[in-house]
Amino acid sequence: RSRGLGDVYKRQMLDVARNFTKKADLLKLIDILSFYKMNVLHLHLSDDEAWRVEIPGLEELTEIASRRGHTTDEQMCLYPAYAWGWNETDTTSLANGYYSRSDFMDILKYAKERHIRVIPEIDIPGHSRAAIKAMNARYQKYIDTDQSKAEEYLLTDFADTSQYLSAQNFTDN
């Protein structure tokens, strides 16, 4: 069978995990992709540096892992990465932000109306430090009151004695 143009992926990958793109700017990008007859938008939504999409019931992913700033324990935000994120309350920074469930549904609908398929990527099990740290914060939040809830989504094995250093100098991902 010969392939028609409709079978070809003309794609754009956007890494919003490391450098967040606000919804309005993402919608503009979708318009540009449509203008150039591109048909796939690959969104890199998570990585070691951040988590960018709301998951109902796991608010720590966005309350903690969508922000970078000064911290000693990463219970409120993640360490700055790639020179971004010195102030976790700066909503204009490329380091901070996430798409709410409603935002993400709007993005999907907007893209579909322009014949663009969105491929959301959640990078696991590797490159999961943002999720790991968020679930550690969740563990700390509940361990004194509800051990079952504290451990339900825990991604850390406290008995693991592995020693390593990632490319970003992390020892816990």
Where are these regions (language model features)?
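Aromatic/hydrophobic pocket-lining residues that form π-stacking "cages" and hydrophobic walls in ligand
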Residues: 29, 107, 118
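Short, small-residue-biased leader/transition segments that mark boundaries at the very start
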Residues: 2-9
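Hydrophobic faces of well-ordered beta-strands that scaffold small-molecule active sites
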Residues: 10-14, 41-43, 118-122
